[in-house]
Amino acid sequence: MTNLPAGASRSATDVVVSRAAGTGPATWAMGMLFERLAGAGETDGLLGASVVTQPPGQASPLHVHTLEAEAWFLLQGAMTYRAGERLIRMTAGDFIYLPQEVPHAFRTTGTVPVRFLALTLPGGLLDIYDEVGVPAAERRLPDAGVSDADVARWLELAPRYGLRVVGPPIPEAEA
C-alpha cells in the first residue's frame, strides 16, 4: 500500500512486503552474499530481512548493535555464536534472538558455507552491507574474500549504523 492521500500517515498494518524467491537485490560484501528480502525502506523502518551466505571459517569481531535487536535462523551449515558470555554451537534449523546491546560474535565452522535468515528489528542495519559491497553479479559467494578495504569501510560506517566493535573474533580453537 503505497498510495496514501496527502497528509495521511501509515501504520504497521499498512505495510505488506512480498518477494518471490531470488527476486530481491543481492549484494557481495565482506566475502558474503546478502539477498535482500525486505529493507527498512520497504517496511517503514520496522524490519530488515536478508538471506546471508557466509563461507567456511569466516568470523566477525565481538560487537554490539545499539539500535536494533537481531535474530537469525540457520538454514544450512554450522557456526559458533558468542552471545554475551555464552558460546552456542548452531546447526541448520537453530534460531537465536539477541536484544540490542548484547555483545556477540560468530564464526562459520565446518566445510560448507552457512546460509541464514537475518532479521533486524527495527530495520536499517543490513543497509551497511549495501554501502560496503557491490551488486552481486550472481547469487553465489563472491570470488574474493574479505579485503582490508572492506573492513576499513565497514568500520568507518559502523557508528552511523549503531555498530560498535568491543573485542576480537571467536578464536578458531574455541569454535
Report residues per predicted region.
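A short, N-terminal "cap"/entry segment at the start of jelly-roll beta-barrel domains
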Residues: 1-47, 141-175
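Conserved short histidine dyad/triad with adjacent acidic residue
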Residues: 35-36, 50-65
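Short beta-strand His + acidic residue motifs that chelate non-heme Fe in jelly-roll/DSBH
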Residues: 62, 81-82, 98, 104-110, ...
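A contiguous, mid-protein "functional segment" used to position or interact
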Residues: 112-160
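Glycine- and acidic-residue-biased ligand/ion/polar-headgroup-sensing regions
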Residues: 67-79, 84, 93
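A generic "binding-loop/recognition-motif" signal
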Residues: 58, 67-68, 86, 102-103, ...
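Short acidic-glycine-tyrosine-enriched beta hairpin
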Residues: 85-103
